[in-house]
Each structure stands twice: as structure tokens, then as C-alpha cells.
Amino acid sequence: MQKLLIEGGHTLEGTVSISGAKNSAVALIPAAILADSAVVIDNLPVISDVDLLAELLREIGGDVDLGNQTMTIHPEKMVAMPLPNGRVKKLRASYYLMGAMLGKFKKAVIGLPGGCNLGPRPIDQHIKGFEALGAQVTNEQGAIYLRANELRGAKIYLDVVSVGATINIMLAAVRAKGRTIIENAAKEPEIIDVATLLTSMGAKIKGAGTNVIRIDGVDHLQGCRHSIIPDRIEAGTYMIMAAAMGRRVHIDNVIPTHLESVTAKLREMGTTVEEYDDQLIISGMDPKKGVDIKTLVYPGFPTDLQQPFTSLLTSAEGTSIVTDTIYDARFKHVDELRRMGASVKVEGRSSIVNGKSSLQGAKVKASDLRAGAALVIAGLMAEGITEVSGLEHIDRGYEHLETKLTRLGAKVWREELTEEELEQVKQS
């Protein structure tokens, strides 16, 4: 196991190129199960979640060739192999295997997923959708069992706007009989990306990206080639890093309209943001003005950038309030920021950040993916050396993080954990 070391205080300057979207990739790969011939996915991020999904598709009989940012999936020999345990539990997004396998085989057994532990992230809306389509769903010994004689289109109203449920119902409905209407659907760009892949395969989907999605079921889906959209969360993370420590940072391979909420908040703080067709240029400015953040479903401020933005706010003037309306337990980074000298406290669903903290390097631990990003940003801003453990979380969602940061002028490197540190990890 490794840790990431960051020598703080170095100015960032230069160009960073954004990878394909993690939150698309983890849905697009299971979607390939639905096809009857080969699916090729380009612009894949090189992250551990993608490797895990490739292994899971192989487990159910798929022939998967994973090259440099490209995956070719041959689904012809896939079977409805039960996956109650093992790798499936390491991955939050393994729940997309439910919708895809239900759509293709009319049955699935999937172990309840893991990934980031952000408090209760129930899949009740997914289950509601599957049942509306005609599936029987039971939870037996920590695995979800899905069975259906046939799937029939239905009108499904989501009680909570959920990206996962919207995509999962789409996956199950594209080969169902008749029309499915998803109301109060999520509108995230990743949903449009999945719908684009499915449409290329022959699915009939209208309204992806709006709050009402209509799907007319088809009997067969053929393979296709699809390129993933850029990762707006990775892009937002580098925007925040550039605002914190950047002189002039070019962020390439982005879709600026996907990041309007982040751009607006950075400008409110005094950061200069220049927008072009597929590029953003960020110039950090001092003094930074404190701002309040409230996470909302897209196109609001993304919950995935709440933790990284909190690190930036420790250097701003005045008091800032960060409220997460999506996940109420997404504040595990706060204790670690406090270790570094930040003045932050949690009250309910909000963290209150008293700015102008002078951060000091410390030993900190990433408890989840975006907490990891927050600690890296804090390390870039801090005086001295910060050691971040829990790198397995960061590697789930950020491709070649230290390589990209080094190119921008940061001093970042990996080291193996000492035996003493390994013992501490085991005990925790």
C-alpha cells in the first residue's frame, strides 16, 4: 500500500488534460451487457473502478479487451451468473449490473455495493422502478435478487431525483415491451451520455437531460462504438486547485457548460475564469472572498465537489457555509482538515469554514474519493509536507493524479507505507 506526499506552497502553471467521465464509464460498461455484439468504449479513464468492472464482465462470461483508454466488450457469451459476493461489493456503481442484467436476462443477483461510504445512499428508487417494470425484487443475505417473467413498460415517478435510479431504470427498460416513462428524472450530463450509447445500440430514448424520459422498448440491441464525455468532476477539481494555487492553468478537454455552477462560485470568490469551446483558463487571485455553497442536483453545484471546495474556502476571507443537500454524511474530510490547522466545524448538513487559516502539512487519511481530493488540495496549499493515506479511494476516480499535478509544477510523489503505518491501517 502507498501514500501520497505533497510538498505545499508551489505555484501551479501549465496545461492539464481531463480524462473521460468516471460517472459515465461505470454505467456505460454494464450497459454493454444489453448488446448482442461487440461494444467499443473510447476515452475511458484509467482508474481502478474501470478495471473492477472489466473483471466483473469477465466473471459473467464476457470477453473484455482493455487497452489504452479503450475497452472492447464482446457480450455474446455472457450469462446471468449470480454475483452475490466478491469484487461486486467493492464498487458502488456495481448496482448498474442490476438494470443491465435484468434487461438482458430477466434475472440478476448482485451483492449490495460498496465504494465510498457516504452515509445512507438507499437504492429504494431503483427497486421501485424495477418492480414497476414487472420484476420481483428481494434482499437476501446482503444481495439483491431480481426476477421477471417479462418486463413491461410503465410510468415511473421518482420520489427523489436520483442519477443512479434514472440510469438503472433506463438500462432495464430499453428491452422491455412497450413504453416506459421516467418522471422527475435526473438531468446530469452522464445520463445523456448513457442514453447516447444506448441509442447508438438501437434503443429508442427521448428526453434524456430533461426531467421526463420516454423509452420505447426494442427486441434487440447491436454493438456500437462510443466515446465518453469529459469528466466534469475531475475538471472541477483542477479548477479548484488552480484557484487555490494557480498562476494561469489551462484545463483542456472540458465542456464548460457542464461546470457553470463551479465557474460562478469561483468568479464570486475573485478567481479569473476564461471559457472557450473545450478549454478553461483559471488564474487564482488573492485575496479570495468567502462564499456560501449549497449542493443541488444538476445543473446545481455538484455534491462531488463540495469537499474539494471546502479546502479552498479555508484560504478565503470571512466565514463560508457549505451545505450538502444530497448526502448528509459527506463531511469526513473536516476532521482531517482540522488536523492541518483549518477552522471548520460541522452543524447538521453544513460545514462552517472560518477563512484565512494557515494550513500546515500533516498525516491525513482519505475516507472516500472526494475527501481524498480535498486533502490533496489542502496539501498543495499547506506549509510543509502532507502525507495522504487511503490512496485506493483516490485511484478510484482520478487518472494519473500525481503525473498531472507534477506537470503543473506541484511537488507530489508516492511512497510505500512503513510497516508501522500498515499496522495502523489494519487496526483502523
Swiss-Prot record:
Pfam short name (any one): EPSP_synthase
A Gene Ontology cellular-component term: cytoplasm
UniProt keyword list: Cell cycle, Cell division, Cell shape, Cell wall biogenesis/degradation, Cytoplasm, Peptidoglycan synthesis, Pyruvate, Transferase
Catalytic reaction equation(s): phosphoenolpyruvate + UDP-N-acetyl-alpha-D-glucosamine = UDP-N-acetyl-3-O-(1-carboxyvinyl)-alpha-D-glucosamine + phosphate
Pathway, per record: Cell wall biogenesis; peptidoglycan biosynthesis
Binding sites annotated in the UniProt record for UDP-N-acetyl-alpha-D-glucosamine: R92, R121, P122, I123, D124, Q125, D304, I326
Binding residue positions for phosphoenolpyruvate: K22, N23
Locations listed in the record: Cytoplasm
Record InterPro entries: Enolpyruvate_Tfrase_dom, Enolpyruvate_Tfrase_sf, MurA_subfamily, RNA3'P_cycl/enolpyr_Trfase_a/b, UDP_GlcNAc_COvinyl_MurA
Superkingdom, natural source: Bacteria
Cross-referenced PANTHER family: UDP-N-ACETYLGLUCOSAMINE 1-CARBOXYVINYLTRANSFERASE, UDP-N-ACETYLGLUCOSAMINE 1-CARBOXYVINYLTRANSFERASE 2
Role summary: Cell wall formation. Adds enolpyruvyl to UDP-N-acetylglucosamine.
Family named by the database record: Belongs to the EPSP synthase family. MurA subfamily.
NCBIfam families, per database record: murA, PRK09369.1, PRK12830.1
Entry protein name: UDP-N-acetylglucosamine 1-carboxyvinyltransferase 2
Organism: Shouchella clausii (strain KSM-K16) (Alkalihalobacillus clausii)
Lineage of the organism: Bacteria, Bacillati, Bacillota, Bacilli, Bacillales
Name of the gene: murA2
